[in-house]
Structures are given as C-alpha cells and as structure tokens.
C-alpha cells in the first residue's frame, strides 16, 4: 500500500511539473522548448560577460600572435570582443575538458565556441517556444516564421560560414569593432556587395524601415480623436477596445492621392502581412547569400570587363570595388600570409628536405 501511494505521489508531482511548464497562465510562458532555452541562453550570456571583461588574448590565426579582446586587457566597449576560436582548433568540438588546462582553452579561444553554440541552440529554442505558445493560444504560426529570419542570419555567420571556410576562427567576433572587421574581410574575400542575395537583403532592411515609418506616420496622422486638444491623443485609446483607433479610409485616400491609387492598401490584413513579409524575405535571402559565399560561391566579378576598340580597359565602379577589395585583403591577417590569395600567382616553394 505504501509503494502504491509513493508512485501516485510521484506521478502527481510529474503531472504538476508538466502543467506548470505548459500552462499559458504564467507571467512568462516556459514551454518544453523553454526548458532547454533557459539554461543555454543563461550559459551563453554568463560566459560572454565574463569573457568580455576578463578573457586573456587568443591566438586566433594559430601563428602564436595572440589578439586581445577583453576590457581588462586594454580594450573598451567599442574595441572589445570575444575573439573567435583559434585556427589551430579548426572545426573541432573544443569543450573545456578537451584542453590540457583552462589556460590552454582560453589561449585557443574556447569561450567563443562555447558562447556561439549555446547561443544558437538557445535562439532556436526561443523560436520553438514562440511556435509552442502560439499553438496553445490557438494563434496562427506567422510569428515564428518572422523570427526565423534573424535566426537564419545568426546561424549563417556563426555556424555555416565557419563550416564552409573550415575553421571557427573565420566566424564573426562577438563585439562592435569585431563585427565591422568581419564585414570588411567578408567583402574583401567574397565581394558580398556584388552578390544579388545581399542586394535583396539591403532592399528588405531599408525597405522595411521605410514601410514601417510610412505606416506608423499614416496611422498616427489619421487617429480618430477621442480627446480634447488639451489632452494627449494617446489618451483616447483603451486597451482591448472594439472600435477602430484610426481611419483607414482617410489614410488610404491620402496615400493614394500622394502617389497613385493602387500604391495604397485597402485591406488592413494584407497590409500588415506585407509589412512583415518584406524584411523577412530580404533577411532570408541575405542568410542564404552568406551560406553560399561560405563555400566560395561569391558575388559577381566584373573586373576589367569594359574595354575600348584598342583593347584598353575602361575602369568602372566594379573595378574600383575590386581594387578596394585587394587593399582590404592585404591588411587582413597581415602576418599570416604575405599576399592576398588573389595575388598569389605561383605555388609556394616546397620546404621539405
């Protein structure tokens, strides 16, 4: 009888735990994806903060020339970063127990791999948690679809690109100036500005900003006034009210006359779908572009493509970009190789006896 009661109590405990995890009545929804999301994101955040403050220099290029990235080693908020894992490690899984000592693990940039892998797992679980909560509330799944765009972009620069290039040392550093360095080197090696998918991403981001500003300003300009002139117009809205808060007909008429009739949406639902889809599709294409360039399927190269009748080159802006790319590549990893790969016309001499 005692054994039966104990089993029933344990079943009730597990049932209560399951209900607590999956209930939508909590202040913050946890969900089964949240069970994995919380520890992974906490780990990534904690290690990032500690490493950004106190991590020793990392031998990123594997040539015994460590690069400093933490605040205690001379950096500030702008120049500081988590330095990517050393080229010596390549794509190997490099947890702390794989190193001979913690000092060796830090010298080879172990924290970067730890942070990136936990972060990617965490944001993927956050995406799953969005789907889980939408499902339990009976909502449509478009929130998780929209969030998949930044998740795809982060996965591209932190995981797909290092895999394609053969080393986590080619991943994006976790810092402000490190991000800019990554962008410059990426342009030098892959000519990303001339890649159609990057162009679509630029159109998505800037177009999304434009459409968001246009929509917000139109709505704000066509609010249905519910207050006096001495009160804020925002006081005329009550959360959950059934009435429209702005006049979509007036906004439609204004915008249609400002540009032309069919440039303005007359359906609020299709309008908001468009506002969500435009930047999401653009960022999807950017992530896809990064993933293809990871395997060196690079942007267009129109180098010296325009010549006159005598065969002389007429420089175009594409040639200016190519020249800038060579200059940036020369500055990159200046001690790891003497010349950019584009200028290395002959094979290196053999050094074997």
UniProtKB/Swiss-Prot annotation:
Belongs to the reaction center PufL/M/PsbA/D family. Residues 345-353 form a propeptide. The chain crosses the membrane at residues 29-46, 118-133, 142-156, 197-218, 274-288. [CaMn4O5] cluster binds at residues 170, 189, 332-333, 342, 344. The D1/D2 heterodimer binds P680, chlorophylls that are the primary electron donor of PSII, and subsequent electron acceptors. It shares a non-heme iron and each subunit binds pheophytin, quinone, additional chlorophylls, carotenoids and lipids. D1 provides most of the ligands for the Mn4-Ca-O5 cluster of the oxygen-evolving complex (OEC). There is also a Cl(-1) ion associated with D1 and D2, which is required for oxygen evolution. The PSII complex binds additional chlorophylls, carotenoids and specific lipids. The lineage of its organism: Eukaryota, Viridiplantae, Streptophyta, Embryophyta, Tracheophyta. 2 of the reaction center chlorophylls (ChlD1 and ChlD2) are entirely coordinated by water. Gene3D superfamilies: Photosystem II protein D1-like. This is Photosystem II protein D1. One of its GO terms (cellular component) is photosystem II. PSII is composed of 1 copy each of membrane proteins PsbA, PsbB, PsbC, PsbD, PsbE, PsbF, PsbH, PsbI, PsbJ, PsbK, PsbL, PsbM, PsbT, PsbX, PsbY, PsbZ, Psb30/Ycf12, at least 3 peripheral proteins of the oxygen-evolving complex and a large number of cofactors. It forms dimeric complexes. GO terms for molecular function: chlorophyll binding; electron transporter, transferring electrons within the cyclic electron transport pathway of photosynthesis activity; iron ion binding; oxidoreductase activity, acting on diphenols and related substances as donors, oxygen as acceptor; oxygen evolving activity. It is found in: Plastid, Chloroplast thylakoid membrane. The modification N-acetylthreonine is found at residue 2.
